């Protein structure tokens, strides 16, 4: 909710008055299936996580847009990517709710999917809720999700009366891999394309640690079978 920005404006500056802040509530630490005893906070220690940092590696521009249903705007980023969007909203209305959904595929143009023609397909994401909800603060602003990532090619935007222009929609590609230390080149364009696809996919699956998939509901560390 970007409307809350004003409430913390200047919070990092000396002289800021936090009189309207509410103290945090302490939540009891209950046992879980992985830990069969209760703990208190005095037994816990915060330690820094040592890993390769996730950085912006590339910025993709939206290639096309379609409106399969009124008010449903679907952007094609041109290829599958891992990261998040950056969307410029000019003259936004304060309190307006924008919903972003992500997909790797569109429904195929087949009779059994006639009612979903042109819409994003989410079945392959299984239980993953690939969605961000943003509340505008008003005026010109950028929508750029934080503390998350998505694996997608297609971006669905709803909640706007008019579709943002292609130049206003970008895809921020993330990875912990800064460079590929090997190369592979053959006389066969298809083999070269396969190599490029493999390295692109590997980049998208290294976010601090190797992961099993950036899209569906796994999104976990992948340290076992990757080494086989």
Regions found by a protein language model. Give the residues of each.
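Extracellular/oxidizing-compartment recognition motifs
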Residues: 1-217, 221-225
């Amino acid at each position: 909710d970007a409307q809350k920005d004003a409430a913390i404006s200047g919070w990092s500056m000396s002289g800021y008055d936090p009189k309207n802040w509410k103290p945090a509530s302490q939540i009891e630490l209950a046992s879980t299936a992985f830990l069969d005893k209760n703990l208190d906070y005095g037994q816990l220690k915060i330690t820094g996580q040592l890993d390769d940092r996730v950085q912006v590696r590339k910025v993709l521009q939206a290639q096309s847009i379609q409106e399969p249903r009124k008010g449903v705007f679907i952007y094609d980023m041109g290829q599958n990517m891992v990261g998040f969007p950056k969307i410029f909203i000019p003259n936004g209305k304060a309190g307006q709710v924008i919903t972003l959904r992500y997909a790797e595929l569109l429904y195929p143009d087949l009779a059994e999917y006639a009612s979903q023609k042109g819409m994003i397909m989410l079945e392959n994401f299984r239980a993953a809720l690939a969605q961000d909800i943003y509340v505008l603060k008003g005026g010109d602003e950028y929508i750029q999700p934080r503390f998350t990532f998505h694996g997608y090619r297609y971006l669905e935007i709803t909640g706007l009366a008019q579709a943002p222009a292609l130049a206003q929609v970008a895809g921020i590609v993330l990875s912990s891999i800064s460079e590929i230390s090997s190369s592979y080149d053959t006389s066969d364009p298809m083999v070269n394309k396969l190599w490029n696809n493999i390295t692109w996919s590997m980049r998208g699956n290294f976010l601090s640690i190797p992961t099993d998939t950036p899209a569906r509901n796994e999104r976990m560390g992948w340290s076992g079978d990757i080494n086989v």
